A protein has these predicted regions:
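Predominantly a Rossmann-like dinucleotide-binding segment in NAD(P)-dependent oxidoreductases
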Residues: 183-188, 193-310
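A structured beta-alpha segment of the ubiquitous adenosine-cofactor-binding alpha/beta core
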Residues: 116-139
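Boundary at the C-terminal end of the N-terminal hydrophobic targeting segment
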Residues: 21-25
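Bacterial N-terminal signal peptides that target proteins for export
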Residues: 2-10
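Beta-strand-loop-alpha-helix segment that lines the small-molecule cofactor/substrate pocket
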Residues: 136, 142-143, 147-195, 209
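N-terminal Rossmann-like dinucleotide-binding module
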Residues: 26-111, 267
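Bacterial N-terminal signal peptides
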Residues: 11-20
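Short, Asp-centered acidic motifs that coordinate Mg2+ and/or phosphate
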Residues: 92, 136, 216
């Protein structure tokens, strides 16, 4: 009996990446124009002979060999979960800081599992992705590394699973789709809010017809991050106290919904998006930033004049 199949991770289609754009920016090379107050983005032309991956099925695997990249805040929890999934072998652990990878290694030892190989440094993920004995690369690194790690993984014949937001602009979204189509490798957005008990229950009810013909839906994600700001404030390994943690820096410099798929993903599943229907227009709104400014002012003892998100 096969304990686990690769497709059991990879239920959602790659097209969900098009939803991540709400939080990120249009890259300079993205072609777009205004149409009655709406930003209209041109859809890249699919190369001749290349097919979409909405129905892509990977060959069944007796054992899924996994490499993890990014073991800071979210990555270690993923390693812990995978330790308890039958049919999984954790082959490699990678983080810029070797000590973080070693912490996850210690968890493997406590579970009586075979030690994984450790990779670290700026190019460690490249070495991991080039291995021949990895089927899936699980990416929980900082956001700016989501795309380059996924690109390296797929170019080396690996399926990829990427934390939100997965891409930082529309060009990267389309590039991930193109890479998945060319390599025929799954590229899965780890949108955890699609798979909580409440959302899965609602999806089952929708598919069973409990709500009838769904013609309108609302979704939301409300999460005050104030409890995390201390952790996001400063890189503990940086002696320059003016250098902020990448997560805090991003919120200070960028507006928008950072990961719209938290609220929109479950709704998209209930509406069967990309299974007959698709989104044509997305609307994003925000308020004036005041909570973030107040927090930074109190933390730093200096007035914060610029905090764009929140």
């Amino acid at each position: 009996k096969i304990g686990m199949k690769i497709k059991s991770f990879l239920i959602a289609s790659l097209a969900a990446f098009s939803l991540t754009a709400g939080a990120q920016s249009l890259s300079p090379s993205t072609k777009w124009h205004w149409d009655k107050g709406t930003i209209v983005v041109d859809t890249p032309e699919r190369p001749a002979g290349q097919e979409n991956v909405l129905g892509l099925k990977a060959p069944k695997l007796q054992t899924v060999r996994v490499g993890f990249v990014g073991l800071g805040m979210r990555g270690p929890w993923a390693v812990m979960r995978f330790c308890h999934i039958p049919g999984v072998e954790i082959v490699a652990l990678c983080d810029y800081e070797e000590a973080r990878a070693e912490k996850s290694q210690e968890y493997l030892r406590k579970q009586g599992l075979k030690p994984a190989d450790i990779y670290s440094g700026a190019k460690g993920y490249e070495e991991l992705c080039k291995r021949k004995d990895i089927d899936l690369v699980y990416i929980a690194a900082d956001w700016n590394h989501h795309f380059p790690v996924a690109k390296m993984a797929m170019e080396n014949g690996k399926h990829t699973a990427i934390e939100v937001p997965s891409a930082m602009n529309l060009e990267q979204c389309w590039s991930l789709i193109d890479l998945s189509e060319k390599t025929r490798q799954h590229c899965f957005i780890l949108e955890n809010c699609c798979y909580d008990y409440y959302e899965m229950n609602a999806l089952a009810m929708a598919q069973d017809g409990v709500f009838g013909n769904i013609i309108r839906a609302e979704g939301a994600y409300i999460h005050c991050l104030e409890d995390f700001w201390n952790a996001y404030w400063q890189d503990p390994n940086d002696n320059d106290k003016d250098n902020l943690h990448w997560r805090m820096k991003y919120n200070m410099e960028n507006r928008g919904d950072v990961y719209p798929t938290h609220g929109l993903g479950p709704v998209a599943q209930c509406l069967n998006i990309h299974r007959g229907d698709r989104f044509t227009t997305l609307v994003a709104m925000d308020t004036e930033s005041f909570v973030g400014k107040d927090w930074v002012s109190k933390k730093s003892g200096k007035e914060c004049k610029e905090f764009r998100n929140g």
